[in-house]
Amino acid sequence: MSDIYKDKTVLVTGASRGIGKAIAYKFAKQGAYVIATATTEKSANQISADFVKNNFLGTGLVLNIADKLSVDKFENNIKNLNSANILVNNAGITKDNLLMRMKDYEWEDVINTNLSGIFRMTKLCIRPMMKAKYGRIINISSVVGLAGNAGQTNYSAAKAGMIGFTRSLAKEVGSRGITVNAVAPGFIKTDMTDELSEEIHNSLLEHITLGRLGEADEIASVVNFLASDNASYITGQTVSVNGGMYMG
């Protein structure tokens, strides 16, 4: 435990598990007040309970970033909390399919959540940051947004769009003391990867120079750095964390 972020309020979307949870915990352990979101009330309540158990400052709240009404309700729910100094746009979904078989809803749902969702959340948080002349926005993209991947045209388009969003917004708000960066994880060890067969797991490792999957905490550490004063001269960048899987 430390107090590096004791005066900061951090908003992390999609924080009930995996990378989002690791990011939320990393900031909470360093003294930040963390608003961590989940799509269900059960998961949000579990986040709140875990925070209490660990003596963290913060709360879990329900939010569906794909639903404007949910975002509006969330905005109302956080009115009595301090405005977020640090926003981590992590929430996202996949609906994989080959393009020729992809249904309209598979395309639209992924774009609406993974790309339009960060527009909604950033717009919600940006005005207080502008007034304070300080802010950190970190968008969780993906190696797929850089390298592409068969069966993921929707996901790849959304994550590549997120990188363009990051660069353009960085140019808009840099003069107000706000930095905007993206992190592009490769294959990260999660509950889903734990369920992969040994054959599939080994085939993944063949494409990773370091010969292992990444850990969620390794992504959280990069996000934590980008939010720190040590990264105050870094903006509009995409940091790849993929073990050498992609070196573009």
List where the protein language model places each region.
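Short, small/polar-rich loop/turn modules that mediate ligand/substrate recognition or access, typified
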Residues: 174, 179, 234-236, 242
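Residue(s) in the substrate-gating loop at a strand-loop-helix junction
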Residues: 142
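Active-site helix of classical SDR
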Residues: 122, 158, 166
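Substrate-binding pocket helix/loop in short-chain dehydrogenase/reductase
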Residues: 98-99, 103-111, 193, 204
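Conserved glycine-rich Rossmann-like NAD(P)H-binding loop of the short-chain dehydrogenase/reductase
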Residues: 30-46
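Conserved glycine-rich cofactor-binding loop
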Residues: 9, 16-18
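Alpha-helical segment proximal to the catalytic Tyr-Lys
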Residues: 127, 171-175, 232
